[in-house]
């Protein structure tokens, strides 16, 4: 029987369409351009977001097609897309020179997940339920599906109303207004308070005791939607409150208090929803033993919950506008694992995982527990396999063989493991980046073999003639007991790459025990071991704030510092005990003024010596400072922004301003923490927030002057004429254009900035101050097939902005 692939995430994603597969359907060969495709979709989302700030119209046609494809049996990484979208929150106004517009974040979420005019609420639940069945072998009841669908419909109606009143208040004729009216401000205020109350009542349905792990992704999306409603209202209030009201008047004081309450409630809800998500996650966490199947079950659950919820939960604190007013990129260094592959695919057994990183001198290594595995700060270049092969004539050829060793080549070091020493050169090359690894094993009368492959290479040196007679089960693969055959069924994880391959041994192996077993750890595809700040947004050229996990550093020589799981942060934390020091290396690509912050948890006030030093000796920060004890944000009391935080497993996480403003030149620098206190402190990430953004792009105009000296190309079947093209490093934003000397019954079709417009006698062959959906670099023109245009002139001007 053909083995059906298990689905790893609860929401489908774009997985290796058309990639060659093994007899189980597992992908082999190159993974293709799945990451490039996703990045292109994110680019489209960004362009739509920028256009929305410009004209108040949010277009997500490409994303709706992706959703329709998922419903029809295809796949689309919606949760990855939302994470990318949330990272654009701070780009508000960045696309409009000199304008800061409080456009609602909720427009993005509603547009991505539930496009208007469709029944995608119910479809989304159906898709999730289908995937849940394949991952966890459990199913939502029809009654609950109907209830959740009703809740999501109500959610959508509410947030859509809030979205509409904000857009109506801030845009007129698709252009940002210069002043919001008092009546429109009150409409926004009223819509916000109606939305918040009903969303709160509906959230409880998503985390019932019976179905909590099945509805976890929907809970995360619902909470994200409510937090985005907070964000949209607060951003609107921050922008317009003091422009609409006299804050010393009774009316102004009332509206000011309403905004302050919204901020307080948002912080409380971020803490509450995070706590609920963590409790749900840990409450359903499978027990972890040393058995292979138990480890696989644990990893099936954790990777599903991380990819489908916890990665988004980690971004919730960044939605609070007063803490994160500019675009920020949070690096995620958490690791997740695919199913263990190799040694014996049809047998369970007690497993010992080998810590391949504990030395570079030997092929033998000590053991490591699954939850002790953390991010290794280097980039995998390739993996190599060493093969054992015995020609077992006259019975068969190449059926007594297996990989016995693995070699991992990183930028800085090479690590190896094997039943015997594999050396430094392998028989099989597996170039990075890799996204999936699988294995097949068979032990029978004249066969004892194993093959291992990834999406970039394979070890098809062994002749194994078995096949599966079962379907794949989560954490089990497939097998055929009568022939001693088994095969893993790992599948690429959305937006993830293999970061390391940990060898393991197991008991109860069929045949020779020297066959290779591997456990793959995965990290986000765009994660680099280099710590860089000062990166610029490619479109706006603004410097992007950066949140870099502290675990990307190193302990002082001779010290052993603990790295500990913290599921809600998107990264592990560094437990810095009294007297210990921790270092991190950075490169700043853009010098300027920065705010430096640290996110941490501590039960006591902790004195920390903080040293930021450049190569060459300059010391912008060289201070002993106290990191205050952090407390959980209370449900009802007033909120102290400095010390109250988000509760995790190891403490309550809060932001500490290390330096409100400091000049950080471009170049290489290092940060060192030393705990001079009497208790441990848990360090999550360092944040570098730029304070001096580049000047807004300058406006100018460029002329349009296109004489028609030959027939203008027809609209159908001919490439259009380019009648204007940018000059210099600019993009067009607006145009005024007209045609003279053309036939009165003719039509000129313009293509500009994603829009199509017609010049004909109905508009006097003229457009005045037209702003297309997107900025543009050229204008194209063609004519109707019915009337040729062979003479005349097209003139006008384009308003452009320097990049």
Swiss-Prot record:
Other facts noted in the record for this chain: Toxic segment of the protein is located in the N-terminus.
Gene3D superfamilies in the cross-refs: 2.100.10.40, Galactose-binding domain-like (2.60.120.260), Pesticidal crystal protein, N-terminal domain (1.20.190.10)
Keyword Nucleotide-binding: no
Keywords: Sporulation, Toxin, Virulence
Gene: cry13Aa
Alphabetized SUPFAM superfamilies for the sequence: delta-Endotoxin (insectocide), N-terminal domain (SSF56849), Galactose-binding domain-like (SSF49785)
Protein name: Pesticidal crystal protein Cry13Aa
Task performed by this protein: Endotoxin with nematicidal activity.
Organism of provenance: Bacillus thuringiensis
A biological process from GO: sporulation resulting in formation of a cellular spore
Annotated family: Belongs to the delta endotoxin family.
Transmembrane segments annotated in the record for this chain: none
Pfam families hit by this protein: Endotoxin_C, Endotoxin_M, Endotoxin_N
MF (Gene Ontology): signaling receptor binding; toxin activity
Domain of life: Bacteria
């Amino acid at each position: 029987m053909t083995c059906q692939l298990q689905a790893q995430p609860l929401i489908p994603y774009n997985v290796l369409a058309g990639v060659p597969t093994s007899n189980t359907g597992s992908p082999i060969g190159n993974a293709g351009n799945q990451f490039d495709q996703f990045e292109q979709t994110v680019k489209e989302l960004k362009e739509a977001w920028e256009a929305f700030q410009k004209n108040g119209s949010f277009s997500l046609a490409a994303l709706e097609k992706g959703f329709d494809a998922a419903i029809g049996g295809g796949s689309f990484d919606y949760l990855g897309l939302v994470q990318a979208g949330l990272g654009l929150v701070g780009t508000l106004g960045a696309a409009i020179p000199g304008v800061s517009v409080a456009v609602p974040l909720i427009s993005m979420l509603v547009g991505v997940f539930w496009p208007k005019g469709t029944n995608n609420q119910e479809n989304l639940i159906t898709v999730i339920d289908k995937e849940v069945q394949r991952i966890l072998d459990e199913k939502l009841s029809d009654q609950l599906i109907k209830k959740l669908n009703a809740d999501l419909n109500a959610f959508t109606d509410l947030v859509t109303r809030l979205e509409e009143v904000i857009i109506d208040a801030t845009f007129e004729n698709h252009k940002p207004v210069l002043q919001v009216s008092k009546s429109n401000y009150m409409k926004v205020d009223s819509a916000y308070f109606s939305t918040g109350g009903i969303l709160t009542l509906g959230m409880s349905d998503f985390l019932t005791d019976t179905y909590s792990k099945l509805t976890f992704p929907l809970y995360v999306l619902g909470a994200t939607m409510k937090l985005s409603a907070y964000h949209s209202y607060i951003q609107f209030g921050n922008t317009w409150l003091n422009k609409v009201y006299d804050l010393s008047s009774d009316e102004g004081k009332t509206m000011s208090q309403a905004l302050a309450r919204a901020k307080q409630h948002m912080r409380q809800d971020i803490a509450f929803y995070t706590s609920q998500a963590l409790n749900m996650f840990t409450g359903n966490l499978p027990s972890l033993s040393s058995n292979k199947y138990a480890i696989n079950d644990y990893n099936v659950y954790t990777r599903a919950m991380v990819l489908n919820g916890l990665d988004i939960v980690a971004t919730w604190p960044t939605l609070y506008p007063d803490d994160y007013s500019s675009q920020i990129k949070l690096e995620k260094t958490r690791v997740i694992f695919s199913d263990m592959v190799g040694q014996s695919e049809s047998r369970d057994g007690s497993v010992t995982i080998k810590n391949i990183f504990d030395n570079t001198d030997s092929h033998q290594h000590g053991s490591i527990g699954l939850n002790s595995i953390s991010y290794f700060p280097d980039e995998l270049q390739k993996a190599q396999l060493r093969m054992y092969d015995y020609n077992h004539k006259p019975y068969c050829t190449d059926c007594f063989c297996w990989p016995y060793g693995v070699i991992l080549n990183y930028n800085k070091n090479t690590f190896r493991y094997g039943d015997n020493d594999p050396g430094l050169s392998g028989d099989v090359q597996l170039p990075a980046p890799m996204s999936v690894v699988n294995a097949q094993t068979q032990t029978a009368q004249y066969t004892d073999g194993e093959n291992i492959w990834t999406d970039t290479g394979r070890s098809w040196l062994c002749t194994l003639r078995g096949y599966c007679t079962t379907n794949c089960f989560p954490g089990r693969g497939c097998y055929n007991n009568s022939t001693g055959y088994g095969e893993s069924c790992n599948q690429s994880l959305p937006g993830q790459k293999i970061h390391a391959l940990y060898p393991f041994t197991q008991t109860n192996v069929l045949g020779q025990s020297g066959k290779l077993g591997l456990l793959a750890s995965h990290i986000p595809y765009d994660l680099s071991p280099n710590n860089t700040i000062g990166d610029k947004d490619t479109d706006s050229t603004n410097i992007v704030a950066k949140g870099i996990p502290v675990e990307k550093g190193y302990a002082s020589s001779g010290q052993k510092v603990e790295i500990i799981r913290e599921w809600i942060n998107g990264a592990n934390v560094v437990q810095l005990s009294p007297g210990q020091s921790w270092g991190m290396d950075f490169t700043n690509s853009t010098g300027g003024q920065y705010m430096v912050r640290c996110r941490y948890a501590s039960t006591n006030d902790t004195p920390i010596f903080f040293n930021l030093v450049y190569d060459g000796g300059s010391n912008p920060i060289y201070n002993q400072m106290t990191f205050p004890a952090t407390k959980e944000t209370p449900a009802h009391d007033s909120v102290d922004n400095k010390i109250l935080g988000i509760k995790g497993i190891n403490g309550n996480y809060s932001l500490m301003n290390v330096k409100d403003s400091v000049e950080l030149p471009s170049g290489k620098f290092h940060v060192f923490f030393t705990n001079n206190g009497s208790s441990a402190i848990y360090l999550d990430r360092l944040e570098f927030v730029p304070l001096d953004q580049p000047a807004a792009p300058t406006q100018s105009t460029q002329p349009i002057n296109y004489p028609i000296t030959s027939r203008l190309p027809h609209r159908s079947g001919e490439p259009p004429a380019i009648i204007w093209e940018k000059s210099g490093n600019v993009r067009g934003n607006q145009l005024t254009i007209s045609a003279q000397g053309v036939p009165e019954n003719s039509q000129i079709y313009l293509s500009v900035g994603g829009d199509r417009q017609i010049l004909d006698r109905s508009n006097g062959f003229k457009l005045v101050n037209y702003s297309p959906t997107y900025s543009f670099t050229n204008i194209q023109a063609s004519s109707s097939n019915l009337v040729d245009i062979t003479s005349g002139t097209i003139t006008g001007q384009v308003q452009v902005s320097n990049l």
